[in-house]
């Protein structure tokens, strides 16, 4: 398994110059040696990136809730939230030894930027400032996971709010639980949105099943819903759980994955976990687009933030991501972010207003992937 960051595509758009600089980056890394604060002593920078961005995340132990003999969703949400709060208190946000730090983890991206800048200066080349279509300074993806059929009705409320700012979004449906009538999908696509596959059953077990049974279930779903095959180009796993086996299979059906956070605190793995970068990266041909803003559920129900603090946390992270020329990925859930829950609703409305004026390219995952790979391929 090998990764390739989109950062190089943004700052060195000529493929020949990029290849030369990438080789120089490797030589500089050899001279510098191990970077303090990074949890890897890889021999090459490419190995370091792959180790931190993928290997550490997929090596996380299987959470207890996914080992239960029954579906963890039978446990009432307040009880689940209380358990996460307890775990959260055992792993304080400010723990300096944590990797990745939360809500921002700059160390890998800082090292990458430093190496590329030094390599360019030594070669007498000027790196480009990361920009996106129309000179935008970064990109934003608005995504929504639909975790039950009851949540389908909440999509319209969110889209009314997003259309107020002329913003597209992407919506993930669970094949066994929240797969909608075709009319819902057609309406979203006509509205400029994208749909993606959100797990298969969202029971926490998919990544830990044997690969033949995973492959068979995906094949059965697409055989039964052939019309969705060209529309479903991406995937996000339930609870953001991932294993090397599942990640290696996804490219058989999908062109991008949204499962890995750059940093998440209080999630299914107990403490901090994530891929530690705000730049999308290829994993053996599959584009991984990290989830880079904290999810609504955790801010509201685990961190217990009020609306103002939710919004300030989102705004601060949005600015940090865009300042790097990265991709800010937002994930909200209609079950939590809806007009009946004013804390989350007001925070999301404020975030959308900020996004609309942030000088960012607000797009969908497939459009982002197409544009980024166009840069990569020259």
Regions found by a protein language model. Give the residues of each.
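Active-site-proximal binding-pocket segments
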Residues: 230-233, 239-250, 255-263
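Short, surface-exposed connector motifs at secondary-structure boundaries
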Residues: 164-169, 225-233
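Glycine-rich phosphate-binding "P-loop"
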Residues: 142-147, 197-217
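An active-site-proximal "capping" alpha-helix that borders the catalytic cofactor pocket
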Residues: 216-225
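Structural recognition of alpha->loop->beta junctions
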Residues: 191-195, 228-231, 355, 359
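Terminal accessory/targeting
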Residues: 1-183, 244, 251-253, 263, ...
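Short coil-to-beta-strand
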Residues: 188-196, 284-291
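Acidic, His- and aromatic-enriched active-site or binding-groove loops in soluble protein domains
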Residues: 192-202, 254-271
């Amino acid at each position: 398994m090998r990764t390739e960051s989109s950062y190089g595509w943004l700052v060195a758009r000529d493929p020949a110059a990029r290849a030369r600089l990438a080789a120089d980056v490797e030589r500089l890394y050899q001279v510098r040696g191990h970077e303090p604060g990074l949890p890897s002593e890889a021999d090459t920078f490419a190995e370091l990136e792959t180790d931190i961005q993928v290997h550490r995340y997929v090596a996380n132990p299987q959470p207890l809730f996914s080992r239960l003999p029954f579906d963890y969703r039978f446990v009432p949400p307040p009880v689940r939230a209380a358990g996460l709060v307890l775990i959260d208190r055992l792993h304080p946000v400010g723990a300096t030894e944590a990797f990745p730090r939360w809500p921002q983890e700059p160390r890998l991206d800082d090292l990458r930027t430093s190496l590329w800048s030094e390599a360019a200066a030594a070669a007498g080349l000027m790196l480009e400032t990361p920009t996106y279509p129309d000179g935008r300074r970064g990109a934003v993806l608005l995504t929504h996971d639909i975790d039950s059929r009851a949540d389908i009705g909440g999509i319209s409320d969110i889209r009314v709010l997003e259309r107020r700012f002329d913003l597209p979004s992407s919506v993930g449906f669970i094949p066994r639980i929240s797969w909608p009538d075709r009319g819902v999908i057609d309406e979203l696509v006509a509205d400029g949105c994208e749909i993606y596959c959100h797990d298969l059953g969202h029971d926490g077990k998919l990544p830990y099943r044997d690969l033949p049974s995973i492959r068979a279930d995906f094949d059965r779903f697409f055989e039964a819903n052939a019309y969705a095959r060209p529309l479903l180009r991406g995937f996000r796993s339930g609870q953001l759980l991932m294993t090397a086996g599942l990640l290696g299979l996804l490219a058989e059906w999908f062109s991008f994955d949204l499962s890995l956070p750059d940093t998440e605190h209080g999630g299914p793995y107990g403490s901090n976990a994530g891929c530690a970068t705000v730049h999308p990266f290829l994993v053996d041909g599959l584009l991984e687009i990290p989830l880079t803003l904290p999810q609504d559920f955790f801010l509201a129900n685990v961190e217990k933030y009020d609306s103002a603090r939710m919004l300030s946390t989102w705004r601060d992270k949005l600015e940090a991501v865009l300042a790097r020329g990265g991709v800010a990925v937002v994930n909200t859930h209609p079950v939590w972010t809806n007009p009946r829950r004013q804390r989350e609703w007001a925070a999301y409305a404020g975030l959308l207003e900020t996004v609309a004026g942030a000088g960012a390219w607000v797009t969908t995952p497939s459009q982002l992937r197409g544009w980024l790979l166009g840069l990569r391929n020259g």
